[in-house]
Each structure stands twice: as structure tokens, then as C-alpha cells.
Amino acid sequence: MGKRGSRSQSQLLNTLTKKQKKHLRDFGEEHPFYDRVSRKEAKPQICQLSESSDSSDSESDSESEPQQVSGYHRLLATLKNVSEEEEEDEEEEEEEDSIVDDAEMNDEDGGSDVSVEEEMAAESTESPENVALSADPEGKEDGEEPPGTSQTSPEEFTDAKHESLFSLETNFLEEESGDNSSLKASQDPFLQHVNKELKEKAIQAVATNPKTTHELKWPILGQLFFSSKFQKLETFKPPKDIDLKSLHLQKPLESTWTKTNSQFLSGPQKSSSPFTPLQKELFLIMNSYRDLFYPERTALKNGEEIRHVYCLHVINHILKANAQVLGNNSRRRSQKFGVGDDDDFRDQGLTRPKVLIVVPFREAALRVVQLFISLLEGDSKKKIIVSNKKRFQGEYGSDPEERPPNLKRPEDYEAVFVGNIDDHFRIGVAILQRSIRLYAPFYSSDILIASPLGLRTIIGGEGEKKRDFDFLSSIELLIIDQADIYLMQNWEHVLHLMNHMNLLPLDSHGVDFSRVRMWSLNNWSKYYRQTLLFGALQDAQINSVFNKYCVNMQGQVAVRNVPMTGSISHVLVQLPHVFQRMEAENLASVIDARFNFFVNKILPQYRDAVMSHTLIYIPSYFDFVRLRNYFKKEELNFTHICEYTQKSGVSRARHFFLQGEKQFLLFTERFHFYKRYTIKGIRNLIFYELPTYPHFYSEICNMLRATNRGEEATWTCTVLYSKYDAQRLAAVVGVERAAQMLQSNKNVHLFITGEK
């Protein structure tokens, strides 16, 4: 019996976890949590934890079986005992330390760190954070998440406390804010836009109507193309002097805007106008509810200036829309009306979210929210209520110490990659009079701020069980900021988003259909949606989105200034630039035509050992993979660096290329965008395709002077282009030269830079 008892005891010990063994050793008994109770299933009892607790430890699947809850458990659940939580944290740390120690022992014995990786993998599969992320259908695909950005997202939090406080259905317009006179004014742009009723004939004619276009010239914006598929096209003149009262701004924006925007106003301009000249022209277009494409927004120059003005437009739109709803709530409560009066109160969409702001990084989302707070607060001594502000600053802010102090990069790089550059996020914001609710559930939000990847993971794809895009059904204002960066992230996410905008929702989501506008019920929301698109360059893919998905009845305004001098003028080294034009029958055949031209015409010239130290710059990752496979097949002496290359691989490739051990270096544009390393040892340069960013051309060319060993006379630069690269070519060589090169009978053109 003794042996049998000791054997059963040892078996019992073997089944215990490290935490259980530690508790047994310290206290002489198992923790009550692990008491073996009757296996008879009992109805689970829910114990409410105190609201002061910021986080709750989720039990694993094996421990989540329904058990009888003793009075002791209920007591533990209600106690605010911090010491026990700290004790558990210490136990977890000790457990992690033991795992690390075991791994170090294995390393010393010649073993690998596979055990640590397996342990981390096991933990990651159990964590709810990674379970949520596994829903990403493209999480493993190439081009999904570029380097320099976080590939994980913290467990999604939504504010459940302030639902009734920010509800549009149960609140009424406060008398102190008043029913703003601008809402009653017939000339108010907001009311003119949302109250305009389209006719069925006009909608049907859009499919067949040709697009009418007017060309305008404004002092600051320059060349504008104003187009519309609706018959009536009213041209408008550039603004002269703007009075804030004439803009129909909702309270308190008239008083708060001047202070919020003061950093951009200086000298005599400060007293005369509350806008900069650029802001003045942009806001006139925004306030007219026309679509806008502005391709000259740069992080280094005017990025913040533009962010301020579109945030003003967003808050103005939301305050007016919510004031209309709350005012109608008050009217419905104060007066008796019959069934026929319901149409007087149609003031909403099918879902509550009205504004979607797409930004690339968390830092941009942080700045947008800070501007919202500033615009609602202003000089007022009475602070506005911002729920979950501390959590938001913790998740979207950044620690200055995280950035290496000795990191030297170009100014434009520093301006783009500032702060928290995680690119997987989404957050709902609700605004009610002078209060802001951060982390609002999407269907209780007025404004959604998200990255393309953050939206992609919730929208999902065809055939997925968990997907949701109903919250996009009633978006009235879409802002896509820094659109050029999405070309470097994953442009497919932007296209996926646009394909799901303003579709009829699959669920009612508790909407009162008697309050829904008729044009929303008719599924005409896309004709009322205003889209503001900001980027740093003219690109065919961005132009395509604007032309295809922007069908606002008010018309579209696109800024189309042509570059007179190209980025080639910033090349400082003495270098011959040979531009070789290739012929392609159509746009679809360009990719194959370029590859065949390069393999048959260009590459044979560089196979000789004399033409060593050749860097091949490749904008497209798919072209990079194709060339890499070809080089391997042909057994060429080459190395490569792309956005997915490990740091050690990058160091080896740079070393081999500098020493001449590898003749060719395949180099992707996205790696250059995210890292901006200076590649030393370049003597011959090939641009497989013109760069997306024109200033990358001069940056890459100027790398040749990084190792100046008296070889300037042998340096070469070859550029491939076709007639379909007109925009990129104009940005590099200037519009006049580009036109000559595209129309010329000659296929080869030579430029020489750096001549003394």
C-alpha cells in the first residue's frame, strides 16, 4: 500500500505545473484554484471584477471547463488584492527565467535555441492577441507588412462604459450650444449637400454620361482639373479674403481654429487671415463638398498644414451632423406629430460612422486626435472630456529613447518615420458636443481612424466567416492621407477598402429607418461621399483610384502641376545617364517586355568581369523575384537585398558587393524606402524601372561618390523606360525633355550630370 501510495503521489506531482509545485512547496497545499471538484457540470457563475482593474488574466482552454465555484472563489473575485496579482507576475517571470536558463544551458552544450522558439510559439498560439491576428488572410504573403513596422497588434480594446453618454438616440441638444444658426441658413454647404435630392434619371445617366472637364488656374494650387459626370458643372473662383463667419463653422470652431492654426501664421498674415494661402484654397474646395486629389503633400514641407485644415473640415462636418440629429430628437420630444411628418426628421445614414480617415502610422492617428481635442477645446478654460486618453497615448505614442541617437538619415525620411510607426491599427472616435470618446465601438463611432492593414484585417475576404464592412456603408467623408506610403506598404489593401465603401449593410444594426435619409436607403451614398486624397507624387495607381472610385455629385478637383525640372538636376556626381526606351504593345505587356529587353539587350553588356560592381535598382518586388530566379538559373555571380532580407544578410551582401566578390547587387525600392542605407562600391547603375519617388533617382546616383577611388571615368548609369512611364519620366528629367524623349524616333537618349 505504501508503494502504491507513493507511486500515485509521484504521478500526481508529475501532472502539476511549475506554478502548482511552487505553491505546494511554499504553502504545503495546492492553490484552491486547482481543487479537484465533482465532474458533474454545473451552470457557470459569472463574478464581476472591480472596474478599477485595467486588465484581466484570461484562463487557458484547459482551465476554462465549467466548475463549481466555491464561496472562497467568489470572495477572491471581489477582493481588490494587488499583492496576489504581483505574486503571480513574479511566478511568471521566474518561469520565463527558468526557460531562458535552460536555453542558455542548451547553447553551452552545443544545442540550438529551438526549445525557446517552440516555447514562444506555443505561448503565441495561446494568446488571444495572436488568435485575433491569425484572421488576417494575407498575413503570410509577400508584400504584406514591410520592415520597420510592427507585425502584431495589441489586443483590441473598445470602450463599453460610455455608450449611453455618447448615444445619438437618447441625447438631446443642449441649450447652451444652441441650434446653430448656420444649420438653419439655406446657404450652409453642409445642408445644401445632404439635403440635395438626386433623381433616378440622373443616377442612370451617370453610367453613360461623358465626363466634362474644366481647366482652372489658382494662385497657390496651380493647375486644377475640375470634372463631373453630372450635367451641371459650376465653376468656382479662387478665394480672396475669407471671413470665418462666412464659412458656416459650427461652434466652437470659429474661436478655436485661430489658436490651433497659429503655428502656421506669421507676420501680417496672422492678423488678416486665419488660414495660410494653401489652407485657404484647400478649405474652399473641401467646404464645397467636392472630391479633391492633391499630389503635393510632403511630410517635410506642408504635411501638418494640410492635416490641420482637413481636421477642421472633419470636426465641422461631425458637429453639424450630430447637432442636426440631436436637434431633431428635441423636436420629436417636444411636439406631437403624425405618421406623415416622419420625413422631416430624416437626418442619418444606415450606420453611425460618417468619417473615415486612413493614415499610414499610429503617429499620424495620434496627431489627428490631438488636433480634434485642440479644435474642441481652444482657449476655453473648461476642459473637454476625453475618455480613455491615457490608454490612447500609451498605445499610439512613442518613447523618444527608443530611437537611436546616432541614426543619420535624410530629412524627408526623418519626417515620415517619426514617432510610433506601427501600421496595424484601427480606432473609433465618438464626438458629442464637447466630449470625445476614444476606442468607441465602430457602430457607435462618428469617426474611424485606421491604417489600410487595420481595415483589411476586419473587412476580410470572400469566403471568410468573420468579416465585417457594414460600418463603411454610410461614410460621408473619406480622407486618404499620405497615399504614396501605401504604395510602399500594400496597395491591394487600399483597393480592397475602396471596393467595400458605401455598400448596403448586411444587418440593420438597430437603425431607426424612419430617420434614415432617402438617398442612403436608395444605395446612393457613394454619390454623396466626399473623398479627399493627399499624396506626395503623381502616380498612375493613385490616379486610377481617384478616377474610378470618386463619383461625388458635386464633382472632382485634381491638382495637376507638371514638374518643369526633374530630380536629375540634383545628381551631384559626374555621370552619363543613358535612357533606353523599350517598346510595348499595351500596358498589360509592359512587365514581360521590360524583362525580355533587360535580359536580351542590357544584361549581356554587363556580363563581362570589367563591368563589376553593378547595382540593379528594382521598384517592384515581383520583378525582383523574377530577376533573382533568372540570375540563379544562369548561375550569375550576384547578391541581393530586399525588404525581407535579414540584417545579417544585408551586411554580408553589402560587404561582398563592396569587395567585388559579387558582380551584381539586386536592390529593391521598398528596402531603400524603409532603410535608406548608403550602398558603397557602386560603379555601374541600372534602373530596371524608373523610381516611384523621383528624389530616389538622385539619391541612388549620388551613392557612387560614397567610395571615390578615382574611377569616375568608368561610371555608368542605364535607365529603362516605356511610353507608359510618362509621369515618372517627367518627374526625373522634366516635362519638356520627357515629351521629346517619348515622341522622338530615337530609342536612346544621353544626359550627363556633374559637368564643371
From Swiss-Prot:
Phosphorylated. Phosphorylation is required to promote p53/TP53 degradation in the nucleolus which promotes cell cycle progression and liver development. Residues 54-64, 84-121 have a biased composition (Acidic residues). One of its GO terms (molecular function) is rRNA binding. It is found in: Nucleus, Nucleolus. InterPro entries: P-loop_NTPase, UTP25, UTP25_C, UTP25_NTPase-like. Residues 1-159 are annotated as: Disordered. Residues 636-697 are annotated as: Represses p53/TP53 degradation. Residues 1-185, 573-635 are annotated as: Promotes p53/TP53 degradation. Its main location: nucleus. Keywords: Developmental protein, Nucleus, Phosphoprotein. Expressed in colon. GO terms for biological process: embryonic organ development; maturation of SSU-rRNA from tricistronic rRNA transcript (SSU-rRNA, 5.8S rRNA, LSU-rRNA); positive regulation of embryonic development; protein catabolic process; protein destabilization; protein localization to nucleolus. The modification Phosphoserine is found at residues 10, 50, 52, 58, 60, 62, 64. One of its GO terms (cellular component) is small-subunit processome. Residues 25-43 have a biased composition (Basic and acidic residues). Belongs to the UTP25 family. PANTHER family: ORF PROTEIN-RELATED, U3 SMALL NUCLEOLAR RNA-ASSOCIATED PROTEIN 25 HOMOLOG. Component of the ribosomal small subunit processome for the biogenesis of ribosomes, functions in pre-ribosomal RNA (pre-rRNA) processing. Essential for embryonic development in part through the regulation of p53 pathway. Controls the expansion growth of digestive organs and liver. Also involved in the sympathetic neuronal development. Mediates, with CAPN3, the proteasome-independent degradation of p53/TP53. Interacts with CAPN3; the interaction is required for CAPN3 translocation to the nucleolus. This is U3 small nucleolar RNA-associated protein 25 homolog.
